[in-house]
Amino acid sequence: MRVESLLLALQCLLGFVHYSGALSTCSPLDLELIKRKRIEAIRGQILSKLRLSKEPEVDEEKESQNIPAELISVYNSTVELNEEQAAPPEQPKEDPVEEEYYAKEVHKFTIKLMEKNPDKFLWFNITDISQTLGLNRIISQVELRLLITTFPDGSEQRLELYQVIGNKSRYLESRFIPNQRKWLSFDVTQTLKDWLQRSEAEQGFQLKMADNCDPQKTFQLKIPGLVLVRGDTETLAVNMPRPHILVMSLPLDGNNSSKSRRKRQTETDQVCTDKSDGCCVRSLYIDFRKDLGWKWIHEPSGYYANYCTGSCSFVWTSENKYSQVLALYKHHNPGASAQPCRVPQVLNPLPIFYYVGRQHKVEQLSNMIVKTCKCC
């Protein structure tokens, strides 16, 4: 039976060789055409993700005004978080579930300033967070961010994060302390969701040094913003890199996520060269002003969207009994088009800072930067 199936498949493919010869219209790949189509696709994609029917009109007077420091801080923090969380190409997510299509609005909430803070508490105004987010939003991601500026010498140590519950605290997770000035991030998505279901006006975290031998070990880290330094002005307080949470959320009606099918895939993070004909990632920089004619996006000025190109000459796995037939078909019909590589595997998000009329906004656009491609 196995031999008969193999012969039947072989006959079908060899028959297709003669048929495809008459229909073959292979032509050199027009990279400029692909770029133009990719740019136009991105134009529509960004507007769609932001739920805009057309590009916003630029308010020249508003554009020339000073941008609020708070929004610049939100944008910069989002960029830093994305850089830290970017998946290395050599460790792609296997069988990923697609992120929500629509843009996620980003909000930044800093801790309550305290004159003294010996127990290293991080208090947040939950009432303010709830009112800012509103009721009809889905919280997608929440990250607690701390800047470590002074670190202990000697052996490697850990910083532990606890959730404050009344007079007690519950352990959440820990991070190894870097030996350099660096931001630390903790995923506190579920914690904030729980807080928003309660009635308390304030909720908080506590930081502790991990030490099994000495639980009361002195806190040796310096984290700016844990206490209010005497003499701080309002401007300095705003610009101080205080501990904060970044909340990414989207409206209830924008949660149109779909799960990807599980299947075997061949993936590549290979960057295309002039001689590349196999599946690869081709670099494409989009300048918002030059390529799209947009002045309403303040930051960034552009980004590397990239795209997948090339062909997948061998897409069946060695486990498939018909792989020999495919190889034989390619041998007899070398001019036939191989399966195109047009499917991104790993895509990174893009935060943008833009104007809508007289309003400034910071939002995160999911799946905008192609990092790796796959043959499927």
Swiss-Prot record:
Keywords from the UniProt entry: Cleavage on pair of basic residues, Disulfide bond, Extracellular matrix, Glycoprotein, Growth factor, Mitogen, Secreted, Signal
List the Pfam families.
Answer: TGF_beta, TGFb_propeptide
Glycosylation sites per record: 76, 125, 167
Q: Which Gene3D superfamilies match?
A: 2.60.120.970, Cystine-knot cytokines (2.10.90.10)
Query: Segment Arm domain: which positions?
Result: 69-258
Keyword Cell inner membrane belongs to the record: no
Q: List the disulfide bonds.
A: 272-280, 308-373, 312-375
Identify the GO cellular component terms for this protein.
extracellular space
The short motif Cell attachment site is annotated over: 230-232
Q: Which residues form a coiled coil?
A: none
The signal peptide, as residue positions, is 1-22
Chain spans, region Straightjacket domain: 23-68
- Molecular function terms, GO-annotated: cytokine activity; growth factor activity; transforming growth factor beta receptor binding
Q: Which GO terms describe its biological process?
A: positive regulation of cell division; positive regulation of microglia differentiation; regulation of cell population proliferation; transforming growth factor beta receptor signaling pathway
Record InterPro entries: Cystine-knot_cytokine, TGF-b_C, TGF-b_propeptide, TGF-beta, TGF-beta-rel, TGFb1, TGFb_CS
- Chain intervals for the UniProt region annotation (Bowtie tail): 214-238
Quote the PTM field. Transforming growth factor beta-1 proprotein: The precursor proprotein is cleaved in the Golgi apparatus to form Transforming growth factor beta-1 (TGF-beta-1) and Latency-associated peptide (LAP) chains, which remain non-covalently linked, rendering TGF-beta-1 inactive.
Cited function: Transforming growth factor beta-1 proprotein: Precursor of the Latency-associated peptide (LAP) and Transforming growth factor beta-1 (TGF-beta-1) chains, which constitute the regulatory and active subunit of TGF-beta-1, respectively.
Subunit = Latency-associated peptide: Homodimer; disulfide-linked. Latency-associated peptide: Interacts with Transforming growth factor beta-1 (TGF-beta-1) chain; interaction is non-covalent and maintains (TGF-beta-1) in a latent state; each Latency-associated peptide (LAP) monomer interacts with TGF-beta-1 in the other monomer. Transforming growth factor beta-1: Homodimer; disulfide-linked. Transforming growth factor beta-1: Interacts with TGF-beta receptors (tgfbr1 and tgfbr2), leading to signal transduction. Interacts with EFEMP2.
Family that this chain belongs to: Belongs to the TGF-beta family.
Q: What is this protein called?
A: Transforming growth factor beta-1 proprotein
